[in-house]
Design a protein with these regions (language model features):
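A transmembrane-helix-recognition feature enriched in membrane-embedded lipid enzymes
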Residues: 232-251
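Membrane-interface helix-boundary motifs at transmembrane edges
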Residues: 51-63
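Membrane-embedded alpha-helical segments of integral membrane proteins
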Residues: 5-52
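Helical transmembrane-bundle signal
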Residues: 16, 20, 43, 73, ...
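Internal/C-terminal transmembrane anchor helices
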Residues: 60-83
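A structural signal for short, hydrophobic/glycine-enriched beta-strand patches
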Residues: 79-238
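Residue-level signal for protein termini and structural transition zones
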Residues: 12-16, 67, 89-92
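Short, Lys/Arg-rich, polar N-terminal cytosolic tail immediately upstream
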Residues: 1-2
Length: 251
């Protein structure tokens, strides 16, 4: 490849790496930001110093091995992203009787929902408004930095938006997606509610949430919402890694 196109591609890789790391500006750092940024920086280095990498990968068997690993990893990543997108698009049919399960995430120290939790609450509100007979489970416990449980924050916010409090059940003991769905499933059965559930969570989260819902005996559908633009890439990458880890470990 000519030097100028290589430089342009290297700059694009650097810019993409910076994009993945943008959440650092608001104090967020997780694995889904790190591994794509590291790979993009490696690509930028490969484009900038091609002779060094040619010497590094001089043995044909090593080049073939690296090529196979890259092909397998890219296939797995793209297949996982495709399944995630399909799960996010799997919404309930018109007129279908579903119970909404809102999955909690960070609550700010002042008791207000984070941007991501606000998106999930808004998705639940839209569904509950369109289906006035539907009930909702607010699911999420409380960690050390949160003044109230995530479930309580979800409930309080929905009530402030006009949803009747008697339509909202609390599940405030869970500390993971697995527990969100397992504990919500137990509450659904205790109250005799429909086990067809519309999961109010970010689009990237729908596939893993659906897997845990199915393992808890529920029939999941998406009540998904878009994530804030500067968080989206990193969380899709983190979720991809989490799903592939589940496949590899059988968890």
């Amino acid at each position: 490849m000519a030097k100028t196109p290589r430089r342009i591609l290297a700059v694009l890789c650097l810019l993409a790496a910076v994009f993945f790391l943008l959440p650092l500006g608001i104090g967020i750092l997780h694995f889904g930001m790190v591994w794509p940024a590291a790979l993009l920086l490696l690509c930028a280095a490969r484009l900038t110093w091609p002779d060094f990498f040619r010497r590094l990968l001089r043995p044909k068997w090593l080049r073939a091995l690296v090529g196979c690993v890259i092909a397998v990893c890219m296939t797995a990543i793209l297949a996982t992203l495709g399944k995630m997108a399909m799960a996010a698009a799997d919404r309930p049919a018109d007129g279908q009787d579903c119970t909404v399960v809102v999955l909690g995430c960070q609550v700010f120290p002042d008791g207000h929902p984070s941007l991501m939790l606000r998106g999930r609450i808004n998705a639940a509100y839209d569904y509950l408004t369109a289906h006035p007979e539907t009930l909702c489970i607010a699911s999420g416990g409380q960690n050390g930095s949160e003044p109230i449980s995530e479930a309580q924050c979800i409930r309080d916010t929905l009530v402030s938006m006009g949803i009747a409090p008697e339509r909202i059940l609390l599940e405030d003991q869970s500390a993971s997606t697995e527990e969100n769905l397992a504990f919500s499933a137990a509450l659904l059965r205790e109250k005799g509610l429909s086990t067809d559930v519309a999961i109010a969570s970010d689009n990237f989260h729908q596939l893993r949430a659906a897997i845990w819902a199915q393992r808890s005996g529920l029939t999941p559908y998406s009540d998904g919402c878009a994530s804030p633009w500067f968080l989206t890439a990193g969380y899709w990458a983190r979720e991809t890694a989490a799903l592939l880890y589940m496949v590899v470990t059988g968890s």
